[in-house]
């Protein structure tokens, strides 16, 4: 029997099922904390597209799927919890203004006493980029520069920066976080893996514990070694689904990921039939129990 005790369990905020009542969101966050869950994940989509459009719309989410804005929701959750950590999974960084995200993330880090991590991705939905007035086709290249700019803003009181996509003319944000905000990257494109190895504090795979995931990890380890960066302390967050699972499947999945060096396992409890806050908490508890037995 492998020891799954060291694997930190995170929970995915049930974005489309929690509703809009702040007392329900508070009860959920406090319930997750009471279960001893290490982190809460919040997904990010700013706009939902109307599928009734020329050429149709292919994508997992449309205008009828609710997404709570992660940074403002985490600021609220920070105020009603004490230990629960938080990670955006993943914020679509290139469709947002870099300096503003740096400012907001710093604020959440301060309000939560450094319980916040920024998970970032590049997204896939052109409708959101258009609505947010950001360029879609250079989003990967911009993301790398965005992270560099944010780290400068978090650390320095005056920046004179000219990049390919950013110009900061002797300015910075205030207040700044008292500790570095960890940045984790989601995705598996080769350029993204290079970026994660070079700039990331962790990786968020969007796949199963398979050969492709192992190849991604090997690639990042090699890249970090080349750059003289340690792989110790580099986090890996995979995700399990409550829906369609049972104790055996969850344990098998967790062990497969643990064998690959995964540090954090997040469980998503939505899309498993209608339920309420208590129901979501019971699902998390059931998943936890399966891994502890």
Question: What residue ranges belong to the model's regions?
Answer:
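Active-site-adjacent structural elements that line small-molecule/cofactor binding pockets in enzymes
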Residues: 1-293
